[in-house]
Design a protein with these regions (language model features):
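Alpha/beta-hydrolase
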Residues: 38, 43-45, 57-67, 144, ...
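N-terminal cap/lid segment of alpha/beta-hydrolase-fold proteins
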Residues: 30-89
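C-terminal segment of classical bacterial N-terminal signal peptides
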Residues: 17-26
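Active-site glycine-rich loops that stabilize anionic/oxyanionic intermediates
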Residues: 98-110
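Short beta-strand element of the alpha/beta-hydrolase
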Residues: 91-99
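Short, solvent-exposed loop/turn and secondary-structure capping segments
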Residues: 58, 106-109, 140-143
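Conserved alpha/beta-hydrolase
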Residues: 114-140
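Bacterial N-terminal signal peptides that target proteins for export
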Residues: 2-11
């Protein structure tokens, strides 16, 4: 990659980062607990399972933009796993599976910006493995076509996950719930939802 192109990409990245940072940085900073630094010995991402499908025909390297997929393969229906191993591993590893409508993001943080379950277990000496299940999140490649829903379902998620009830346009947490019920936290919770990319 030439230096001019690299500089352009860096400038675009910096612009996007600054725009995104302006929308969330203050909120996250106000809601992060002060804790000791977390030391991770190793971390990475890998994919597991899935299949490889091949389309009939012959791939033509001269025509990169043809849309039939003739003679090409697609790696699909795999899981994607983010793992982190603490510097001092003293307990059994933990595997985190998300629920319906979610991804591993739900284990990584809380709606009000505090450390999530994954970091809590890391601090306690557990290796953590955070799975994005097939056809969801970072494992979105699918062998089964379908229509991604655009239905407006925020309040249903709030109720189905037993956080509370939605009444008169407001979230009402269940008694004893520790869910942070300020407007920003509710907004961040709804932004954790993610669709299936293929029918199951």
């Amino acid at each position: 990659m030439n230096s001019k192109k690299r500089l352009s990409l860096l400038m675009i990245g910096a612009t996007v980062t600054s725009l995104m940072g302006g929308t969330v940085s203050t909120y996250a900073a106000d809601n992060t607990e002060t804790t000791e630094p977390l030391t991770i010995a190793e971390q990475g991402i890998f994919s597991a399972g899935g299949i490889t499908i091949t389309s009939d025909g012959t791939f033509n390297p001269e025509d990169q933009w043809e849309e039939t997929g003739a003679g090409q393969t697609s790696h699909v229906d795999y899981a994607n796993v983010l793992y982190q191993i603490p510097e001092e591993e003293t307990s059994l590893p933990m595997v985190f599976l998300h629920g319906y409508g979610q991804s591993r993001m739900g284990w990584m943080t809380t709606p009000d910006g505090r450390e999530g379950w994954a970091e809590m277990f890391l601090r306690d000496g557990h290796s953590v493995y955070l799975v994005d299940e097939p056809r969801r999140g970072e494992a979105g490649q699918t062998s089964v076509s379908g229509t991604i829903s655009t239905k407006t379902l925020d309040q249903r998620w709030y109720t189905q996950f037993r956080i509370g009830r939605w009444e008169d346009g407001k979230s009402v947490p269940n008694e004893g719930s520790q869910f942070p019920n300020d407007d920003n936290s509710v907004d961040q919770f709804f932004r954790q939802m993610t669709p299936d990319t293929g029918m199951t």
